[in-house]
């Protein structure tokens, strides 16, 4: 996991069934159409998560041919286009997803993360806040984490901290929120709280170069030479070719 970037949530495969037909025949036809759409959406999402982008695109195109305005089909197609770095198409499909169902929290979340990634921070946070306000949405911790990361880019540390703390209130072991709270605390000169957050991070997640370098900086600020040396050794041993390992001598006054 790259904790320095926005976290894209697992794709929700719930397709909203909307409306009632005026006759049994039309109801049956609509139900058939929805089932076909849902099947292609689920297949497309599965292929996307496995990195099989071409096959995922084919399935999602079939879903959209069947139901062009389906919110979840457009949402997942938007994520696919984002992965393909076709940002214009991603934006178009995200807008269609929200037009199809403005209360789809998965679409609001993914679109908000996309906007933050593209530098549209205020608009991104607005969509993330809409997703976070849905009490039935199972990824509210991740939404708050993404909003916090987005606001750190602005930068707006006080508001970012509010979202990150909300994420930890929902999930006290959420690694990204722990890491970014450690970073926020360290950046504001609060090295002791930063130590607490980074220690909790290591208890709930695997080592990463970014987290180990931050831990080295924190212990350097706290003048704990033993802890600093221990984290530095882990960084050099586990990630010897990482940029973070190369930064040790400048980041915390350590020899190459």
Question: Model-derived features: where do they sit?
Answer:
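Helix-start (N-cap) detector for alpha-helical repeat units in TPR-like alpha-solenoids
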Residues: 30, 36-38, 71-72, 105-106, ...
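Canonical tetratricopeptide repeat
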Residues: 42, 76-79, 110, 144-146, ...
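Register position in tetratricopeptide repeats
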Residues: 49, 83-84, 117-118, 134, ...
